[in-house]
Design a protein with these regions (language model features):
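N-terminal beta1-alpha1-beta2 submodule of the flavodoxin-like/Rossmannoid cofactor-binding fold
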Residues: 1-98
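Conserved catalytic-site loops of classical short-chain dehydrogenases/reductases
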Residues: 66, 117-118
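Short helix-to-loop capping/linker segments positioned immediately adjacent to catalytic or ligand/cofactor-binding
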Residues: 69, 107-108, 127-130
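Alpha-helical scaffolding within the catalytic cores
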Residues: 102-106
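Short, conserved loop/helix-junction motifs that constitute active-site signature segments
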Residues: 108-114
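An alpha-beta-alpha
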Residues: 120, 124-135
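Conserved small/polar residues in nucleotide/adenosyl-binding loops
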Residues: 140-142
């Protein structure tokens, strides 16, 4: 199986790198027929104007059977590089298309449905406020 790991943490000594990614790599290396490729968004210095890098990322997404996202959550958001990755790689025409329902309404149809996705998100906040906010997000109306 082809595995793609996308890391969105700037610190090479972080738990995202040494804990989560290290464990995924060890497990996959211990099993036969497992290929692993890694995208380190901070090491690659991803910026919106890096078209060659973004095209390479799209090729890796197509290549993969499984995609692992590893990122801290800062101020209840993904890191800027991870957000840039989603904005620039998973674009209409590549990851999905809009299917019209009416002239003014459409829904997205995925081109990546067969991919298996796992997300590993870390945070430094106490768990109670995080769980309270995330579990009640659908109840909060701003």
């Amino acid at each position: 199986m082809k595995n793609l790991v996308i890391i969105g943490h700037p610190d090479q000594n972080s738990f995202c790198h040494n804990g989560i990614f290290g464990k995924i790599k060890k497990i996959l290396n211990d099993h036969p027929n497992q290929e692993i490729k890694t995208i380190d968004l901070y090491k690659d210095k991803l910026h919106r104007d890096k078209k060659d890098l973004i095209n390479n990322y799209k090729k890796l997404v197509i290549w993969s059977d499984r995609i692992y996202f590893i990122s801290p959550v800062w101020w209840f958001r993904l890191t800027p590089k991870m957000e840039t990755f989603f904005d620039e790689v998973f674009t209409p025409g590549f990851a999905y298309e809009f299917v019209n329902i009416t002239k003014t309404y459409a829904y997205p149809r995925s081109f990546l449905k067969k991919k298996k996705i796992r997300c590993y998100l870390t945070h430094g906040a106490p768990s109670l406020p995080v769980k309270t906010i995330y579990l009640n997000l659908s109840l909060i109306h701003i």
